[in-house]
Amino acid sequence: MIGVLLVNLGTPDNPKTPAVRKYLREFLMDGRVIDIPYIFRSLLVNGIIAPFRAPKSAKIYQELWDDRGSPLKYYGEDVVRDLQNKLGDAYYVRLAMRYQSPDMKSALADMQSKGLKKLIVIPFFPQYASATTGSVYERVMELMKDWQVMPDL
């Protein structure tokens, strides 16, 4: 079986301020996103950006979300469903977010249980950037480093 992991940047678990704050912290604490020493990044993100930006961002997320939830997430799920239908049973397609849910760790663990022969990782970004595509591939390698059986990538 061939696994296809579609990865988008991420979205908060809900449009309320605590969830948005959690999302911002996870996203902005990635050293590939804000490329400064950890201590300064931590002070900036946890002391300034997350506390002050989360309430404003939550209001915007509340306007974007609808009955299905986050458009970024449910449109991604729609793509997974359609791609799975097109590719058939020889493929196993999953959606993951680099930050938040559905998380890459769970998606890869699920894919590992399928005994994949090959894994195709497709970031949903229009071009390569260290902060996006680079972060996705780095996280995939980090999560797969202890796998006993490694699929072709």
Predicted regions and their residues:
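Active-site-proximal alpha-helix that buttresses catalytic centers in soluble enzyme cores
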Residues: 1-153
